[in-house]
């Protein structure tokens, strides 16, 4: 199935299955390694975040931005390898109540239980399409922690339109396209070498 969402709610997440195609409109936030750690640290210290991540979409990306007059313009925004956030993502999800993660390469299969328990979906963005994805960024609404973390690690609040195509690669029902592919590869390998 193919879906377009203006806001991806937990109810919407439950409808999505591995292999579905998704396009996003509305607000998304970038967050890589350092941003994840900063957000976790703040929330565990009972500090209020300067943005609301409840039922939001996090994009594992370190964009290239350009300042034009008083506004930021997105030049490039390709996905970061999500496995870099494997060790902190469970705690991040529990603390923030996000709805979706957009990234590249998937995440460890142990997170499928967390996705199921908290109603989260992992959407795979196509690698090598950073300039194309930047065309879907209609506006940069804000940037957080820029001075502290630097451009790629800062949290960028973006308004996107027709952002995609994204593939549901890990759903909230315990399914992973990566696990399915691995299983098929090993079955074929066993056929070929006669195990």
From Swiss-Prot:
Single GO molecular function: L(+)-tartrate dehydratase activity
InterPro entries attached to this UniProt entry: Fe-S_hydro-lyase_TtdB-typ_cat, Fe-S_hydroAse_TtdB_cat_sf
Keyword match Transcription regulation: no
Active site: 36
Keywords, sorted A to Z: Lyase
EC number from the UniProt entry: 4.2.1.32
Pfam families: Fumerase_C
Enzyme class of the recorded protein, top EC level: lyase
Top-level taxon of origin: Archaea
Catalytic reactions of this protein: (2R,3R)-tartrate = oxaloacetate + H2O
Residues reported in the UniProt entry to bind substrate: 104
Family matches, as PANTHER family: L(+)-TARTRATE DEHYDRATASE SUBUNIT BETA, L(+)-TARTRATE DEHYDRATASE SUBUNIT BETA-RELATED
Family the entry assigns: Belongs to the class-I fumarase family.
Complexes and interactors: Heterotetramer of two alpha and two beta subunits.
The protein's name in its UniProt record: Putative L(+)-tartrate dehydratase subunit beta
Organism of derivation: Methanocaldococcus jannaschii (strain ATCC 43067 / DSM 2661 / JAL-1 / JCM 10045 / NBRC 100440) (Methanococcus jannaschii)
């Amino acid at each position: 199935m193919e879906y377009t969402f203006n806001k991806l709610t937990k109810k919407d997440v439950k409808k999505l299955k591995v292999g579905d195609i998704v396009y996003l409109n509305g607000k998304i936030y970038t967050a890589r390694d350092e941003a994840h750690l900063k957000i976790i640290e703040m929330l565990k210290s009972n500090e209020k975040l300067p943005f609301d991540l409840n039922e939001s979409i996090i994009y594992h990306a370190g964009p290239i931005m350009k300042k034009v007059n008083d506004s930021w313009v997105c030049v490039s925004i390709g996905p970061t390898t999500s496995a870099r956030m494997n060790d902190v993502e469970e705690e991040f999800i529990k603390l923030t109540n996000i709805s979706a993660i957009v990234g590249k390469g998937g995440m460890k299969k142990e997170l499928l239980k967390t996705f199921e328990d908290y109603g989260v979906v992992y959407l795979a963005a196509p690698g090598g399409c950073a300039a194309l994805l930047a065309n879907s960024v209609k506006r940069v609404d804000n940037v957080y922690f820029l001075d502290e973390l630097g451009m790629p690690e800062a949290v960028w609040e973006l308004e996107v339109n027709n952002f995609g195509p994204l593939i549901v690669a890990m759903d909230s029902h315990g399914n992973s396209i990566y696990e399915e592919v691995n299983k098929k590869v090993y079955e074929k390998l066993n056929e070929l070498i006669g195990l």
